């Protein structure tokens, strides 16, 4: 997959791709069903806003396709892939588990429904065994630990665009439609009715 495309395009293009993770010879895979684009120094919701560059976010300034893993709330981790612009990247928000599902469920604590295994950015990190120590700064196009495979093509009419989740105090950037997900996919983390017009869907916010 060509990573050398603008961040918002990459966020859409990643939908339908298979995220694969190998640990001690065992591989788990999930189809990416939800993403968010963070556009770099101009984006007030982005870790690199204003050109901010630290050891924590340095992966966002590396070549397109570099994995960026960070922690929230001191315990949960989130997985991102850098895009071609300096400081920009795509947050992978949700997966549809497809291979090694029982192992993914076990990592999530055992008795978890399939749709709840990886329907959130930190849930998917737990399910896939993605940690900052192991995966941050890995290049996804050349890693034996984590990589992408072709899944299925997601046509434009299948893609819903909406506001990113949990963005506060960022002015106009709170309203930017930079979150993308596959329409009617039950593994998406959160669906807002207004993003789907008159269609009857719930609006449920899940664990990060």
UniProtKB/Swiss-Prot annotation:
Instruction: Give, as one word, the top-level EC class.
Output: hydrolase
Could you list this entry's UniProt keywords, alphabetically sorted: DNA damage, DNA repair, Hydrolase, Nucleus
Cellular compartments per GO CC:
nucleus
Main location (coarse class): nucleus
The subcellular localization recorded is: Nucleus
Primary role = Hydrolysis of the deoxyribose N-glycosidic bond to excise 3-methyladenine, and 7-methylguanine from the damaged DNA polymer formed by alkylation lesions.
Q: Per the record, what are the reactions this protein catalyses?
A: Hydrolysis of alkylated DNA, releasing 3-methyladenine, 3-methylguanine, 7-methylguanine and 7-methyladenine
Q: Which example biological process does GO assign this protein?
A: base-excision repair
UniProt similarity note: Belongs to the DNA glycosylase MPG family.
User: EC number(s) on record?
Assistant: 3.2.2.21
Q: What is the official name of this protein in its record? A: Probable DNA-3-methyladenine glycosylase
Give one GO molecular function term.
Answer: DNA binding
